[in-house]
UniProtKB/Swiss-Prot annotation:
Residues 65-82 have a biased composition (Low complexity). Component of the large ribosomal subunit (LSU). Mature yeast ribosomes consist of a small (40S) and a large (60S) subunit. The 40S small subunit contains 1 molecule of ribosomal RNA (18S rRNA) and 33 different proteins (encoded by 57 genes). The large 60S subunit contains 3 rRNA molecules (25S, 5.8S and 5S rRNA) and 46 different proteins (encoded by 81 genes). The 5 acidic ribosomal P-proteins form the stalk structure of the 60S subunit. They are organized as a pentameric complex in which uL10/P0 interacts with 2 heterodimers, P1A-P2B and P1B-P2A. Gene3D superfamilies: 1.10.10.1410. Residues 65-106 are annotated as: Disordered. There is a cross-link at K2, K48 (Glycyl lysine isopeptide (Lys-Gly) (interchain with G-Cter in ubiquitin)). Phosphorylation is not involved in the interaction of the acidic P proteins with the ribosome, however it is suggested to affect the ribosome activity and to participate in a possible ribosome regulatory mechanism. The N-terminus is not modified. Transmembrane segments: none annotated. CDD domains: Ribosomal_P2. This is Large ribosomal subunit protein P2A.
């Protein structure tokens, strides 16, 4: 994500994004750079406009299912244990993301 953000910043400023410029942006804010990831992002974005990237991203987001419908009262009683287990798993997943030393673009 940090590489994409740097790519978009360069593009918005009217510059042609390349590996050197992306590295310079990320290093200016103290982010460690992985050369193979920079190359991978550049090759994946080669020949695409920002508008195409946004359209493609919107299509992918539209495909992500939203929250499911609320269950009926009778069904909730039957699936209470399953819901409690799912809630515990979600809480554990949320807690694992709490400030693990990641920066803004990690």
């Amino acid at each position: 994500m940090k590489y994409l953000a740097a790519y978009l910043l360069l593009n918005a400023a009217g510059n042609t994004p390349d590996a050197t410029k992306i590295k310079a942006i990320l290093e200016s804010v103290g982010i460690e750079i992985e050369d193979e990831k920079v190359s991978s992002v550049l090759s994946a974005l080669e020949g695409k406009s920002v508008d195409e990237l946004i359209t493609e991203g919107n299509e992918k987001l539209a495909a992500v299912p939203a929250a499911g419908p609320a269950s009926a009262g009778g069904a909730a009683a039957a699936s209470g244990d399953a819901a409690a287990e799912e809630e515990k798993e979600e809480e554990a997943a949320e807690e694992s993301d709490d400030d693990m030393g990641f920066g803004l673009f990690d």
